Amino acid sequence: MSETRTVSMPAADAPTVDAPWPVSVLSGKIKGWIDRLGTAWVEGEITQWGGSGGNVYGKLKDLDVDATISFTVWSSVRAKIPADLGQGARVVALVKPNYWVKGGTLTMQVLEMRHVGLGDLLERLERLRQTLRAEGLFDADRKRRLPFLPGCIGLITGKDSDAEKDVLRNAQLHWPSVRFRVVHTAVQGDRAAGEVTRAIGVLDEDPEVDVIVIARGGGDFQNLLVFSDEKLVRTAAACRTPLVSAIGHEADRPLLDDVADLRASTPTDAAKRVVPDVSEELSRVQQARARIGMRLTSQVRGEIDRIEQLRSRPVLASTSWIVDSRAEELGRYIARSAELAGRVVERGMQQTSELSRQLRTLSPQHVLDRGYAIVQTADGSALRAPADAPDGTGLVLRLAAGALGATSTGPTDDIPSSAARLPASPAPDARPASGPES
């Protein structure tokens, strides 16, 4: 909220290298231009407030960008402005720029000053909140889990503050070996937002830092507005390292609480939540060991019972049982094999006898034994037809027990009647009735 008047710069002969202006001339012209500017309403945050001789000297910072101006409140005006104004307050002021020629300094003379309306602050804060929410910076799925046991904790807090002491003391009570990297910053005033923002960047770049805690021990609404600074909040949201907000104000939560991965109600609460309690963890380990021991004991007992059951079975109670059962089975196989072998031998002997008989039947000697004779010529050829032995042909009659010599008288039709009753010779192609039995 501001009100300004535009003033045209007075024309003047431009200085040159040969005709430069004296410093006093330049200073006088600057003062003239500034005096013509008149008064203006400005809005900002008081970042410095100090009194001397009834007067107040301070600085006013822009709410959105990094810009600061000095101001002076004369004692005559001091009595007319609210008594509770001071560092950290957000105000609107009617100021008149003054340029001090002798020192070359510019300051704003405060003619009026009042608190910014709480409604205006809340409205501006709510607009920023809605913008950040629309960008997804408050989404739950952006929240990262804190490491179970951080190797090093980055702590951003005021130097020698109660918040620093609370975090260090309680964290070390829970886990004595925990390590910290502490970055001290202003936690209120015009430097706070910038210093906290830079500290987040420094710790986020440190590979040893596993989690970052921003801690302040509470404060009024005005003092906590620094933790709703847009640049600070966006830097916290972009931080790659899990971040914990421990500002410690329940009624008016700063925007930092909404983008942090974890919001702690107090610095003490933050310390307890970023490191585990060593006594609780030891107790859990002991309980786990006890459960594992009981389970292992139960399993061992179960296996022992199974082994005893197996040992009580016949197959394991007497190992000779296996040999005996196999011996009986082997005996049955041997007896069966002997029986089958005997049958095969007997069948073979029968077949051999039959073949021998058949061979004897087919043998020429067998024919001779039956009373027949073989008639051969002198050259040993068997005589088959009468015409082959004309009268006077020498013959040999081969009998079963020897041979006789004879001479043919030629073919004759006079065959003794007894010759017709001689047994017929067996067929020369006679074979055994059947082959070997399989």
Swiss-Prot record:
It comes from Clavibacter sepedonicus. The keyword Transmembrane helix does not apply. The gene is xseA. Heterooligomer composed of large and small subunits. Pfam families: Exonuc_VII_L (PF02601), tRNA_anti_2 (PF13742). The keyword Hydrolase applies. Its EC number is 3.1.11.6. The lineage of its organism: Bacteria, Bacillati, Actinomycetota, Actinomycetes, Micrococcales. It catalyses: Exonucleolytic cleavage in either 5'- to 3'- or 3'- to 5'-direction to yield nucleoside 5'-phosphates. This is Exodeoxyribonuclease 7 large subunit.
